[in-house]
Amino acid sequence: MRILFLLFSLTFYLPGYSQRSETVYRTKGDSIQNYYKVLIPDTVSKGLLVIIGGFCGTPIDVMQETKLPETAVKAGYTVVIPYLVDDCSTIDSKNLYQTRLESVIPEVIKSYNIPKDKFIIGGQSLGGHRAMFYTEQAYKANNEKIIKPNAVFGVDPPLNMKRLWDTFTYLLRINFSEISIEESREQLRRFRIMYGGSPSQFPKNYEVASSYYPDAKDGGNAKYLKSVPVRLYCDPDINWIIENRRGSYATMNATDLSGCISQLKLLGNKNAEFVTCLGKGFKPDGTRHPHYFSMLDPEEFILWANKLLEIK
């Protein structure tokens, strides 16, 4: 299987250290989507770390925004950064991302000789939601074909699609920030296609698509994480939101994240954490922004992962 996939891959060494990197293209002739980057440690793999970027976030984008991939591979993890659907040019109304992710995980575990029982998945923004949703479906289905993560994390992901619809509607209505106006208009268009219309028209569609839904019993899909270690990172800088977006706590992903962790604790999850990263979010160019991967501390993350997976 690995020989076949590597026919369509590029292999090179990462600058500055000896680990190899491969980009595996799963569809012949398509270098735009359905591919993933693999960072390979120079030792026997200690485990698998899957990191999913945000909306339109390629593997290159992820590696520019956070040192987590290189920190993890230096610590002995095999790191996979997938780009399975090109969000910029398509609308994933059939959740093709989930289907492809379910097949990618066993593929890389087999191809790169990774321990099957040492697997953490996570991501930033939409990538964090996708990681949460994947984990929920894995534990919900109880299907051996869906590899179950030992833990899941998200860096400021939106979890409740109904709340996100309301946020976009508000930002469009107040007409304050040009960036917010453009994003809100485009995302509302996508939501209408993906879910059929608004949450009031199709509440069930929004519940099914959300990785946390406070209107549903036990948080909706979140209930499937009641026994899974969960970390949700957030830079809850309300003053930045007020000054730059004229938003409120209700428009922040922090609302979803704190609610989800509280719900998991109500369900008995003793390993559900809301990680506050106030003031730590920055763009790669150094511009302050509380919605960026940089809020996560890579070194501390690896200490957490090693302890969780009992890796020395």
Language model features: what each stretch is:
Residues 110-111, 116-175:
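Primarily recognizes the serine-hydrolase "nucleophile elbow" in alpha/beta-hydrolase
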Residues 287-312:
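Catalytic active-site module of serine/aspartate enzymes centered on a nucleophile-bearing elbow/loop
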Residues 92-113, 133:
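Alpha/beta-hydrolase active-site loop
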Residues 18-43:
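N-terminal cap/lid segment of alpha/beta-hydrolase-fold proteins
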Residues 193-273:
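Serine-hydrolase catalytic core
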Residues 44-46, 51-90, 242:
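Short substrate-entry loop that stabilizes the transition state in hydrolases
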Residues 1-20:
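Bacterial Sec-dependent N-terminal signal peptides
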Residues 166-214:
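The alpha/beta-hydrolase serine catalytic core
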